[in-house]
Amino acid sequence: SGAFIGSSYTFATARDWARFGQLYLQDGEWNGERILPEGWVAYTRTLTPHGVANLGYGAQFWLNTGGENRRWPNLPEDLYAMNGHQGQHVFIAPSHDAVIVRVGLSEFDNWRMSDFAADVLAALPAPAAGAGP
């Protein structure tokens, strides 16, 4: 409350962004201690009341909802992400127990974070049956 801009101007290292993503992947717990309120991560992963599924926006996170029309069709439907200015991304994929961070400026049109993330997820061991939320 009282925040002029709640969506921007957060500066951190790639490692700190990865930790932040890991905190969300772990449902708001860190080293056995609850940091975020119970249910907060589920709330952030819920489509906003007037949201359109394939535009997929939750509470400050982009969602990969909408079935075949989802934002990143080549990525898991449970994936959610923070996308920042000039190519800053934190992708969280619960079904793969993975956080993917990219910080950097992309000045060429053919860079696609979703393709990069799909390649990273494909290189990881297959998710265990029943993995994810």
Predicted stretch roles:
Residues 9-13, 33, 51-53:
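Short, conserved, surface-exposed binding loops centered on an aromatic residue
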Residues 45-99:
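Active-site Gly/Thr loop motif
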Residues 18-25, 41, 45, 62, ...:
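Non-transmembrane alpha-helical segments in soluble domains
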Residues 28-37, 111:
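Structural helix-adjacent loops and short alpha-helical linkers that scaffold large soluble proteins
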Residues 8-29, 88-104:
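Active-site-proximal alpha-helical segments within enzyme catalytic domains
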Residues 1-7, 12, 39:
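Active-site helix/loop module of the DD-peptidase/beta-lactamase fold
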Residues 79-133:
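Structured C-terminal helix/loop/strand segments within mature extracytoplasmic catalytic/sensor domains
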